[in-house]
């Protein structure tokens, strides 16, 4: 791992304010996954991190405590973020009843997961009252957000067993993270291992996963492949999903640290009512390939980094299964370069990035003079960002400020951020900040036209200024956190119902949307005993809009959200984990009582609902057996437009892990 050097040092047996001495007091080997200079991995539960505590290369190494010295941090592309909030931690939630990334994030108060089908087959990520298009999605710090539509952004080829943590990042420099960014981090379960998991259950559900890792000296390799399928929980909701992912890291003694990742995903799924609630016969198929390479190098007081990434996505949508209606072929290319300088006055960072987006489509973009295969339209655009940031920590205070410019087809825009923190007592941190963000219209916003929708080529970027306050406290096994925010959004893009355009939805940005929210969470976690973990969280959102227009999505935010998680261990090898959550969504939707007939409809308000999930597990040696039950109370609910989601669903599985 970069900045970890092997040397002979005494093995201290108490805390001595040295990096290695903190671990030495544990009297054991330590597996280090993500490690930053301020030991953010130890403070994850406080829901606070400074800008320098962001994700680093997740390379696992087991190191003898008496042979390790820590000299610095690995800079990463996300180091310039203003704050970092944990959404999921694999170690803390290892026994939780979660099978997919969507089910893991559903309990977080900051995130609104809106699913259209079972087991996360089609879902959107909404952050703090924003839309799915306002969410940036990162994989190990690399931006893989889809420029066509946010529907595809988190279609990433990583299974839950490979994901070590998920964080919410605020203040990401540049264009894209209007409401925030979700950073998904992967890491091996162990240094060297081979793991197989298989599961099956109701509705013809089947899941198989094979993963493993090899670590040798300065080299580490993680690889995984999986298959998930179901016959569906109602008509035309069957699905099949294939994932393949690999991540390799190598630290060259002189050349620096290299981090390579690549993956592929293929999905097909019945889309009963997914995009038009009255049509039960829709169908969709997508495939995504992605890759990135990151380089890090430290030279004295300087730290240098660079990254390059590529994502390709194919999407086929059938209004009636078997008859292709829309086809899209998108390419997203990104590159980033940055440098840090540590000096007496703090740390100064200078960086820039470039992104190129291109689409071939049957209906998005500008008409081609000659078709490109089956595609009749195409569009390309480029964006660039430059930023300068300075951060300083002294005693109990920290302060950071950044300024930058974004170069887009819509002109040049200035962006900024400012944050500060204070630690009045051990374990307690108070933080405050403000940052400016913007989002470009997606290709769908600009060009999508259908019998029910009209596009708008005059759209311009959305803009917002967000103000944050957070407080976190951790002592022994307890943690508490509070976060509150206010986002002043301008030129918000949404689909607006227009009777003067023939009763159709029109893509517009005529509104101002101010969003206020508060998030509370607390928890108790221990390694031994009967009661191992209890967490409780609550989130509240309210908005103020300057118009009474009928909009398709901006007002369908999660107004109240509360979640309770409990984990107990008994009979030596048994564990039971339960999660209970209550949801109360603002807004309404159109209900069609007769499938296939849009002439009969009624407007209904979203109703509150309750979900209870559980996992009973037995584990011994290399073997783990489990039984999962989701929506135990068989609640009837929907996240989007009256699309019914699964009732009670039982599955069972086995996981075998060989390794060290």
Language-model regions, residue ranges each:
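N-terminal periplasmic "start-of-domain" segments of outer-membrane beta-barrel proteins
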Residues: 62, 66-96, 123-124, 132, ...
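Extracytoplasmic beta-strand/coil segments of soluble accessory domains associated
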Residues: 102, 106-143, 164
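Short acidic/polar hinge/loop motifs at secondary-structure boundaries
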Residues: 142-171, 185
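Short strand-turn segments of transmembrane beta-barrel domains in outer membranes
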Residues: 164-165, 173, 179-214, 225, ...
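Flexible loop and strand-edge segments within Gram-negative outer membrane beta-barrel domains
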Residues: 230-237, 241, 251, 255-332
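Outer-membrane beta-barrel signature, preferentially recognizing the C-terminal barrel domain
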Residues: 275-299, 423, 429, 436-490, ...
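Gram-negative outer-membrane beta-barrel transporters
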Residues: 392-396, 486-488, 509-592, 633, ...
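C-terminal beta-signal and adjacent terminal beta-strands/loops
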Residues: 582-597, 617-660
């Amino acid at each position: 791992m970069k900045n970890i050097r092997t040397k002979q040092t005494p093995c201290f047996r108490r805390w001595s304010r040295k990096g290695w001495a903190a671990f030495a007091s544990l009297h054991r080997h330590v597996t280090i996954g993500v490690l930053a200079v301020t030991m953010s991995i130890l403070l994850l539960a406080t829901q606070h991190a400074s800008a320098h505590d962001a994700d680093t290369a997740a390379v696992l190494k087991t190191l003898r405590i008496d042979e390790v010295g820590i000299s610095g941090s690995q800079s990463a592309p996300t180091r310039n973020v203003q704050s970092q909030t944990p959404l999921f931690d694999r170690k803390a939630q290892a026994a939780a009843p979660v099978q997919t990334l969507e089910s893991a994030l559903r309990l977080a108060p900051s995130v609104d997961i809106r699913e259209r089908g079972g087991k996360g087959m089609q879902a959107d990520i909404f952050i703090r009252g924003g839309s799915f298009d306002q969410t940036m999605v990162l994989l190990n710090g690399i931006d893989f957000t889809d420029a066509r539509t946010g529907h595809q952004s988190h279609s990433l080829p990583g299974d839950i067993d490979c994901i070590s943590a998920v964080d919410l990042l605020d203040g990401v420099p540049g264009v894209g993270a209007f409401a925030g960014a979700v950073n998904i981090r992967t890491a091996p379960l162990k240094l060297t291992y081979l793991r197989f998991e298989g599961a099956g259950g109701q509705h013809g559900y089947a899941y198989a996963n094979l993963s493993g890792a090899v670590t040798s000296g300065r080299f580490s390799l993680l690889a995984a492949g999986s298959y998930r399928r179901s016959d569906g929980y109602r008509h035309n909701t069957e699905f099949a999903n294939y994932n393949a992912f690999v991540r390799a890291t190598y630290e060259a003694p002189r050349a620096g640290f290299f981090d390579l990742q690549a993956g592929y995903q293929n999905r097909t799924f019945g889309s009963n009512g997914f995009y038009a609630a009255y049509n039960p016969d829709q169908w969709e198929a997508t495939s995504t390939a992605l890759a990135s390479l990151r380089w890090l190098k430290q030279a004295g007081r300087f730290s240098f980094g660079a990254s390059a990434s590529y994502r390709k996505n194919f999407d086929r949508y059938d209004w009636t299964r078997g008859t292709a209606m829309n086809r899209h072929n998108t390419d997203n290319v990104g590159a980033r370069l940055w440098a840090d300088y540590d000096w007496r006055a703090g740390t100064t960072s200078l960086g820039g990035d470039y992104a190129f987006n291109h689409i071939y489509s049957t209906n998005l973009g500008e008409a081609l003079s000659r078709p490109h295969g089956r595609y009749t339209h195409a569009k390309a655009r480029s964006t660039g960002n430059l930023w300068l940031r300075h951060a300083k920590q002294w005693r109990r205070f920290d302060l950071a400020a950044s300024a930058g410019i974004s170069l887009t087809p819509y002109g040049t825009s200035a962006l900024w951020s400012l944050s500060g923190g204070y630690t009045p007592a051990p374990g307690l941190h108070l933080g405050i900040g403000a940052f400016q963000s913007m989002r470009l219209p997606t290709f769908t916003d600009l060009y999508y036209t259908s019998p029910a929708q009209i596009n708008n080529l005059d759209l311009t970027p959305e803009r917002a200024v967000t103000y944050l306050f957070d407080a976190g406290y951790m002592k022994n096994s307890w943690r508490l956190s509070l976060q509150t925010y206010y986002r002043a959004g301008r030129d918000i893009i949404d689909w607006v119902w227009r009777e003067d355009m023939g009763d159709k939805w029109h893509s517009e940005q005529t509104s101002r949307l101010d969003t206020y929210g508060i998030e509370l969470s607390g928890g108790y976690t221990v390694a031994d005993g009967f009661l191992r973990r209890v967490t409780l969280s609550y989130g509240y959102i309210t908005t103020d809009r300057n118009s009474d227009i009928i909009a398709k999505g901006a007002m369908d935010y999660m107004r109240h959200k509360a979640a309770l998680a409990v984990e107990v261990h008994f009979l030596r090898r048994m564990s039971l984990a339960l999660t209970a959550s209550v949801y109360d969504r603002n807004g309404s939707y159109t209900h069609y009582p007769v499938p296939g007939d849009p002439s009969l409809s009624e407007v209904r308000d979203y109703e509150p609902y309750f979900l209870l999930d559980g996992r009973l597990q037995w584990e011994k040696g290399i073997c783990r057996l489990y039984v999962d039950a989701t929506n135990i109370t068989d609640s009837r609910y929907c996240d989007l437009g009256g699309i019914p989601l699964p009732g009670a669903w039982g599955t069972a599985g086995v996981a075998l892990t060989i390794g060290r």
